[in-house]
Regions:
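Short juxta-domain linker segments that transition from a proline/glycine-rich
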Residues: 1-333
Length: 333
């Protein structure tokens, strides 16, 4: 689907899908792009399906990489025939599909495989190169690498996104790395080991440079690269890694930085040292930090599911009243 769309607008790669390509892609799917100053804060884009207009923030209100991904994700919903989600599982599934579509649109498979193949020949595969060549976010580049590298090059891989405290937002693997999980196997909100690259990157002398590290674990030794994304102000860690055996194909595999993790053994990093327990148990009373960012996109209405969780629909409808499009509002007062 993305290949046909890109060919239709004249993109033949390799390299960045241009702004003109994106505008033409929107038209190919039957939409016009409109950049506005007053998009509601709770929405990344608003689509008027009656007038076939997709509203996105002005360039000065969002980074160009962010704006490109928002356009591509929005087009993905329509290209894939998504309907209003009926429950939260449906909503999440549609988001995942639209995000994958966006990655495939902005970093086309054939072009990405060409870049990765050339880099593999030099032992220099890097997420950063995809980030720069295709002008996409580091996280999207990391997802695209992990989408394609096992299928095309038989290299096992894992991906993590975590916050400065090590709490996982997203993670998946096919290389056997031991991801933390609760009794039900849920990984979101679990804390990664203190000695993993995703945590150690924040402790390094230059925490905003790429952090390369080998970590010995109960499942084997893994090489990882961690990048700290500062967009949004919190500074989340995006980590990609593979087994020690396959690290030779990646830039940064020559690092001498090594650590050992004994997790899930609680004595590794989850339990405080016995001496500290003896000194302070019973007299320490911390107040937990609010981790509201984990639930900011979740539905807050306990009575009924909202098809667009986290979005203030009053603001959305007010916005559309201000931007009625050429056909005007569907039901004028």
């Amino acid at each position: 689907l993305t290949g046909a769309a890109l060919a239709a607008v004249g993109y033949h790669g390799p390299g960045t899908v241009s702004e003109r390509n994106l505008t033409d892609l929107a038209a190919w799917f039957g939409f016009t792009l409109a950049r506005v100053q007053d998009l509601p804060a709770s929405a990344r884009s608003i689509s008027d399906t009656r007038n076939r207009i997709i509203y996105v923030p002005q360039r000065n209100n969002a980074s160009n990489r962010t704006a490109r991904s928002v356009i591509a994700q929005t087009l993905g919903h329509f290209a894939l025939g998504h309907h209003d989600p009926v429950d939260f599982e449906d909503y999440v599934g549609q988001r995942v599909e639209a995000n994958y579509f966006a990655g495939a649109l902005l970093a086309p498979e054939k072009a990405v495989v060409s870049v990765l193949g050339d880099a593999k020949d030099r032992g220099d595969i890097s997420v950063e190169d995809l980030n720069e060549v295709f002008y996409i976010s580091y996280e999207m580049a990391a997802h695209r690498l992990t989408n394609l590298i096992t299928r095309h090059f038989d290299i096992p891989i894992h991906f993590q996104r975590s916050d400065p405290e090590g709490l996982l937002w997203k993670a998946y693997e096919n290389d056997g790395v031991l991801l933390p999980g609760d009794a039900d196997g849920t990984i979101e909100g679990q804390r990664v080991c203190r000695w993993w690259s995703a945590r150690q990157a924040f402790e390094s002398e230059d925490s905003y440079s790429l952090h390369y590290q080998y970590t010995s674990t109960a499942a084997g030794t893994y090489w990882c690269v961690t990048h700290i994304e500062v967009e949004g102000g919190r500074g989340d860690a995006v980590t990609v890694g593979t087994t020690e055996e396959h690290a030779r194909w990646f830039r940064g595999s020559g690092t001498t930085r090594r650590a050992t993790s004994r997790c899930p053994d609680p004595t590794c990093c989850r339990q405080p040292p016995p001496a500290a327990v003896r000194r302070w148990e019973g007299v320490a009373w911390p107040s937990a930090r609010d981790h509201s960012h984990f639930v900011s996109g979740l539905p807050t209405d306990t009575v009924a599911f909202s098809a667009f969780p986290g979005v203030d629909m009053t603001d959305v409808y007010s916005f559309l009243d201000r931007h009625p499009g050429p056909s005007g509002p569907p039901h004028p007062d």
